């Protein structure tokens, strides 16, 4: 991912290939541009971008529920419509969460950058400093604990979490079947 002025860019791993979403903030709007290996992935890329920006929330309902709390009410009034950022890729989110344990944000960012540089998939067409996609669950599952600059047990946990199971992956994403995901978790 990269940030350049008012534009945030990040790679997307999609069903038919890779892509990059560029989100630009102006005074009144947020615009989005997609660069995709396959245009058939456009709808999925838009859905992931909506999740990233929390565009499907209901700000009025959230305001109504949170504004009754005396501590939250002044904050809600000061920043109405504020949204909680999401993440477009649950595998990447899981890996980044584990990488961030017991290290600083800068340290976690460095570990993630090294992982992408060593094991990420190069984009067909780099966009604004984004050159690689985050490694897939299958790629991470194929690594050894020593490939991570962290304690061996944490690296092994990452590999296990990304390892395939008979009916898919332990990693849940939008559209995952909950019962199958729960059944796939280790005891």
Where are the language model's segments positioned?
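HhH-family (HhH-GPD) DNA N-glycosylase catalytic core used in base-excision repair
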Residues: 1-187
């Amino acid at each position: 991912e990269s940030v350049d002025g008012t534009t945030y860019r990040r790679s997307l791993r999609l069903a038919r290939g890779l892509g990059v979403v560029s989100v630009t903030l102006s005074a009144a709007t947020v615009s989005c541009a997609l660069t995709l290996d396959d245009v058939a992935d456009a709808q999925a890329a838009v859905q992931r971008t909506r999740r990233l920006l929390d565009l499907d929330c209901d700000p009025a309902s959230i305001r109504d529920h949170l504004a009754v709390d005396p501590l939250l009410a002044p904050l809600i009034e000061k920043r109405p419509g504020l949204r909680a950022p999401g993440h477009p890729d649950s595998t990447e989110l899981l890996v980044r969460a584990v990488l961030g344990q017991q290290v600083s944000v800068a340290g976690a960012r460095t570990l993630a950058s090294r992982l992408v540089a060593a094991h990420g998939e190069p984009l067909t067409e780099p966009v604004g400093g984004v050159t690689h996609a985050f490694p897939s669950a299958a790629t991470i599952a194929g690594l050894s604990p020593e490939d991570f600059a962290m304690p061996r047990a944490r690296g092994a946990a990452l590999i296990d979490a990304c390892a395939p199971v008979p009916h898919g992956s332990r990693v849940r994403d939008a559209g995952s079947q909950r019962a199958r995901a729960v059944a796939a978790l280790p005891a």
